[in-house]
């Protein structure tokens, strides 16, 4: 473990003698910053300065004062999982009495309810269930597309893809091709957490490695899909590890252009094996969002994470580099299992975006704007968030 930590530090050796102002000026002027620069930004306590730089960079990508959002639902189709992450309160071991696999008809009903209120995206994720074979996933996707041809299936994280490949003794490329052919449209970036082995070995020893997570995303692009990049902080990781995470995401984007968006949030340790860890603050979250926007000069869209941070902090993040409010998320079970529950429907989303001084616009998963809302205009049919 000591050797792993030292290896991460070696990657940012050389440091930087630049001041915070000089680093930010370079970034705002379109120059790339280094991992050493990122570490120096993490060491800074000048949150306002970081936020202003990130906001300036965001406006270069998105000059209009529009904040987008998508109407969608998180469907957790199974909680059986043999990865046993120490920070997860949602999973149950295989064959546990409290585990489940949702019936197809239940999933279909959830999707119908989503479309009935103007929803366009289904984020379907679950545990790494060793009892589910590839045909479970392909048959489910085909059934969904037969009934709901217009719904966008943004589903199955890299860890789930690797589990299917393991169960079937197939390559992840072959698995992804079969899923894409059956109706999978894009891949969410769940399970990235921190892309360094020292942290992953400490908190999720059985989970896919950083390289495997990146390979899944690159392969998804190869077979005709795209994905999102994510980052979770609060595991006790070093600033150097955070910088290395960002570097690996930036490198993958340079190589393949596989990411449409970046989303970060804080570890929610309640009810988990990491409950003794000190929970990070909203300021830590906003700093990470800002530094990520400053560093990741090749990803256009940054989502706010109101699900973990709450609507008010989510609103504030729109001035720290985020141009998107994420999904309204009719249903969410994983974060709420860790005793963190925030509920935001479509009309509250519109209100929060307007309070931030922005114009709300509904988008699809490809970040194409479907509808821009005028002042005081609301959705015709809304929902109550379910858990």
Language model: regions and residue ranges:
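Auxiliary Fe-S-binding modules of radical SAM enzymes
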Residues: 7-9, 13-48, 115, 247, ...
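N-terminal pre-triad scaffold of radical SAM enzymes
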Residues: 51-93, 99-125, 187
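Hydrophobic faces of well-ordered beta-strands that scaffold small-molecule active sites
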Residues: 67-73, 122, 153-157, 187-189, ...
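Active-site beta-loop-alpha junctions enriched in small/polar residues
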Residues: 74-76, 127-129, 156-163, 191-193, ...
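Catalytic cores of alpha/beta
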Residues: 171-175, 236-248, 309-319
